[in-house]
Every structure is written in structure tokens, then in C-alpha cells.
């Protein structure tokens, strides 16, 4: 069986949605600019030798429809030769694409694939424009199939006894870690600069242009403290504990990896940065979807022949503070190695992009810590009751 290596990995900064810095950029453009930047960093690679572009997207409609992956390939690679396919596993979509690319290369079906994800929550609302539940299913008592994520978070908080105080403290720490990471420049190497050219009409009906470059995640809040977080009202239940402050931020962003067979890596004399060791998904009750990693992580560890003591760093998607804490508690995870530079509560959660974004952050942090030949874990809960987890080995 072939070995598949990740050669390059980049992401955009994450913009707030719906009124953040990336709201004027279409998702196909955002992703195309990201892969163009990444591929241009590898002059030895003939773009026509890329077999496919696999793009994760959680809401593939409107500006994200029409098989956005193929459009991204055409726009970003400037060639007709490279195909594209769009993948949807909600919040795990970006990680799923890396697993798909790895599997195809290991099997010999491909030699070189771009894999990642993109999401514009500024342009496409959560769940899409017109979700239509099956009311026969609802009438049979399965309404949790269609629950909003906030309701599932409240269910997790209640079932796993996660207090409001602990949720707010977790959220505060997420912001503090992210702010510290930004000040230290720990994200700088992984972020693709995105130029925005925005034309608008001012209050005097004059046509104006606004130009700027996005290079920094918008989410981390300098003035956040536990007192501020404690004063926020519950969003999903009057007597609940889940607030806007202890939930992930709606966001815009893109992240991509370039994955190659070992033979192609050697031919082009390139240096790999990581390889996906294994990947697993698992199902849980939709009403407590946030607990998904509790089933997915043991599964991927078993498939890899590893245990938690073998894992040096963990990127756990912070969909909500309550579900993150429940996962940490249930799995007995070491908090010191989880989201060392903050998570989705502070940095944002651009749905279909997130799995790839967390992978990019993991590789870069493992490089900075010289964790050569060590293992890292990316995991997240997934809507409608799923969990996903991928284990990577940092290679030097």
C-alpha cells in the first residue's frame, strides 16, 4: 500500500459572520485564492498532475452550490485539467476530505489531491435557506433529528452536569489562549493574506471603494472576562446555561492541504510535513450530538494501535463549551494539550472549513514545538449525532 503525505497546509484568517471582514468575499473566491497561494509555494509541481480537488462544505447551496469544488479548482488552479468534488459531513467536512484524499492515494487511485474546506456563514444561513423536516418523523417522536445545535448543547449540559460557571470559565480561557497566540504570532505562518475590494454607496449616494487585507482572526475578544460572560442571557432555553459567549462563533473561512503519494514526493524532492495515520466516524443520539468524539476517539485510537498517552497535541472543536467539557471529562483528556492556542469559541467555527482548519493549526503547532514523529489528534462533534476523529503523525 502507498504512503500518503501532507506536503503543504494553509488557511485563511477566520472572519466573523455575518458582518465580519470576509463578508464581501464569495466562498469560491476565498477558497480559490487559498489553493492558488498554496500551490504557488511548490514550483516543482505541475498543476495538471493534481488529480482532484476535494472540498468540504456544510451548506452547499446558493454561492456554495453548483459543485463549488469544481469551481474552486477552475478558479484557483487556472486550468481545466483538475476535477473537483464537494463533500458534506457538516462540521467534519474539512477533515473528511483529508481522509478521502489519503485513502485514495494509499489505494493507488490517485497521486496528488488538494483537500480542505470552505464556509461562508455570512452568505448562507445556518441550515441553508429552506430546510424541510419530514413531519412524519417528527410526529413519531424523532424531532431531535432536526434540533438546532443549541438545543443539543443544552441537552448535553444537563445530561453531563456541566455548570454555567464551568462553561464560562472554559470560554474565557479559550479567548485568553487565542489572544496570547496572536500576540506571539503563532498563526502568522499558516494564514493566507486575503485582499478585499468592496464597492458601496455612502449616505450621500456617492460610489465608494474600500480595500483591505485580512491576515488576522477576528474572533478573539481583548476585553472578555468572566464577569462579562456571566451576564449573558441563555440563548436556547430560558433556564438554560448555553449563551452566545460560551458557544462557537459563526464564521467565514477556508483551509486546504496538499496530499501526495510517497513516490511523487520523492520524484519532486519535496519534504512532507505530516501523514494521516487513521480516521474514524461514529454515531450518537442526535439530541446529544456534542458528545460525538467520545465514540469516535476510542475508535480511531484502536484502528491506529495507539492510546491517549501517545497523543502529544489535540485540536478539539469547541462547538460549545458544555460539549467540549463533557468530551474532555468522559474521555479523561489532558487539558494541557487541548487547543493550546484557543478554539472555536474564540477563533470561530466556519463549519465545512473547520476540520481542515484545525488540521492546519495542528501541523503548524507541532512544527513549532519540534514534535517530530509524534502524534496529534483532530476531533469534533457533528450535527445529527455524529463524531469524527483523525490522528496525524508529524513528519520531519
Where are these regions (language model features)?
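Active-site pocket-lining segment
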Residues: 190, 277-346
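Condensing-enzyme catalytic core mediating Claisen C-C bond formation in acyl metabolism
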Residues: 1-27, 224-291, 302, 360, ...
